[in-house]
Amino acid sequence: YNKMYPDYIAAINRLDDNVGKLVKKLKEKGLYDNTIIIYTSDHGSHFKTRNLEYKRSCHDSATHTPLIISGGMFKGGVVDDRLVSLIDLPPTLLDMAGIPIPKSYSGVSLLKEMRENKERDCVFIQISESQCGRAIRTKKYKYSVRTLAPTGYVAHNSDVYFEDYL
């Protein structure tokens, strides 16, 4: 934790500086008002404070990630605590562009959820790398299971899962 955290903070600061430069350049070129900016991450980190892995687990610190959308209907100044998943980004972008969302997509349009004031009651979490785990997350609870395989690389799915106490 102590060794990784300063580098993590430095990376966040560097990213913040570069997003600022990007926004400035978009405004200079007159493109900002016709641009959608999405800031997110594929995982969080608990810096190996919960298990031997630092990011690939179903622990909240590893699965709770930022999602900031600016542009289009997303005008900033709004904090929304609804449950979402990265799988929702493709349908959201298609919806924002006025393109029909294929029925085969698993995610939902966040734009549609906001327009219709809908909110789902849970999201599914799947980890299949260093650990093979699955979880269901509600706003209040999480139920998590994992395989006993040493890594998800060996067995990325299983017929048997065990409760994972996070």
PLM feature segments, named:
Residues P6-I9, N13-G20, A62-T63, V84-P91, ...:
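A structural signal for well-ordered alpha-helical segments within the folded catalytic domains
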Residues Y1-T35, M96:
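A long, amphipathic alpha-helix that forms part
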